[in-house]
């Protein structure tokens, strides 16, 4: 093999590695943005229900807790939204 062929193959390998890294980062950011939109939607729904009825929906609060991976471990009501 000539040196130019070796350089071309090495360049293709490096380009493939860079492409994989970039698309992995894009995919991770896409999932993060999608999850954040879902959280924002649930928070908006909780606010609307709180305005309408004067209290929040427990189902929405539980769903939000699952999404943000936090739970209420205290036996009393904590309004930290």
Curated annotation (Swiss-Prot):
GO terms for biological process: receptor catabolic process; symbiont-mediated suppression of host innate immune response; symbiont-mediated suppression of host type I interferon-mediated signaling pathway; symbiont-mediated-mediated suppression of host tetherin activity; viral release from host cell. SUPFAM superfamilies: HIV-1 VPU cytoplasmic domain (SSF57647). This is Protein Vpu. It comes from Human immunodeficiency virus type 1 group M subtype D (isolate Z2/CDC-Z34) (HIV-1). Residues 29-81 are cytoplasmic. Keywords: AIDS, Apoptosis, Host membrane, Host-virus interaction, Inhibition of host innate immune response by virus, Inhibition of host tetherin by virus, Ion channel, Ion transport, Membrane, Phosphoprotein, Transmembrane, Transmembrane helix, Transport, Viral immunoevasion. Belongs to the HIV-1 VPU protein family. HIV-1 lineages are divided in three main groups, M (for Major), O (for Outlier), and N (for New, or Non-M, Non-O). The vast majority of strains found worldwide belong to the group M. Group O seems to be endemic to and largely confined to Cameroon and neighboring countries in West Central Africa, where these viruses represent a small minority of HIV-1 strains. The group N is represented by a limited number of isolates from Cameroonian persons. The group M is further subdivided in 9 clades or subtypes (A to D, F to H, J and K). Enhances virion budding by targeting host CD4 and Tetherin/BST2 to proteasome degradation. Degradation of CD4 prevents any unwanted premature interactions between viral Env and its host receptor CD4 in the endoplasmic reticulum. Degradation of antiretroviral protein Tetherin/BST2 is important for virion budding, as BST2 tethers new viral particles to the host cell membrane. Mechanistically, Vpu bridges either CD4 or BST2 to BTRC, a substrate recognition subunit of the Skp1/Cullin/F-box protein E3 ubiquitin ligase, induces their ubiquitination and subsequent proteasomal degradation. The chain crosses the membrane at residues 8-28. Pfam families: Vpu. The N-terminus and transmembrane domains are required for self-oligomerization and proper virion budding, whereas the cytoplasmic domain is required for CD4 degradation. The cytoplasmic domain is composed of 2 amphipathic alpha helix that form a U-shape. It comes from the Viruses. It is a single-pass type I membrane protein.
């Amino acid at each position: 093999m000539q040196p130019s062929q070796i350089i071309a193959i090495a360049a293709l390998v490096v380009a493939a590695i860079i492409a994989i890294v970039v698309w992995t980062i894009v995919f991770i950011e896409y999932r993060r943005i999608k999850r954040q939109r879902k959280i924002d939607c649930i928070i908006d729904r909780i606010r609307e229900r709180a305005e309408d009825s004067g209290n929040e929906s427990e189902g929405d609060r539980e769903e939000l807790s699952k999404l943000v991976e936090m739970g209420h471990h205290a036996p009393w009501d904590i309004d930290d939204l």
